[in-house]
């Protein structure tokens, strides 16, 4: 079996599910069941919520390997030297350090891990230029450093520390948690949903990245012109709750191996794609070799 994708978010946080798939209702359920047969069926949860938030920020607009290097460097410099006592692995407050200063909100500090190993406190007080240098492998380091310092400051001010934030994410009402995350500047729907899935272990959450957005519309599981949120709503209402998590990670892997943006396997014929009998091939024209975004194909039909 191939290594699971999105190492920067969920690679080792899943536990294997039973080999018998749940009965699928409709085509979306059949697609996800087949993805489970191709790759893996796992339950997710158990990641530290704030660290998961950090991982998702680092993963934006970069490759997994690059964001993983940035994450490792950040944790080496700012993370706790020992696991938290909890044993977990892995009204809006004003934005801390919301100026162009290269320091955190509390000025200059010595060891960034002085505050009892709390990652949120360490990043809230981090020098922004030092943090940017540390996470440079992820790219857009200045922007991401500013986002991380701001998020850390808000977590510390609103929840006191990373552990309290983790408790909120893992025990709070999922809808309220998602709403609170989306109120944080720099956090979009995919990031919020990844935190709910990989940290909160919430069933029924299907984060939508570029792969999922493309594949769901190409197969015909969502309207061709649907935006990310509409795709998410379609998947979360047509895929069984317990299958949404591995459906997300397995669909990403399927997008990398078979259903790529420009050269999907179906161009070589239906036998080249394990999803051929379930796919509408919206925007894919094997007879000419043309591949367009599903929304463009829809516009062309008008």
Where are each of the predicted segments found?
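Long, low-complexity, intrinsically disordered segments
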Residues: 1-4, 296-302
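Secretory targeting signatures
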Residues: 1-13
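Catalytic cores of DNA base-excision repair glycosylases
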Residues: 20-300
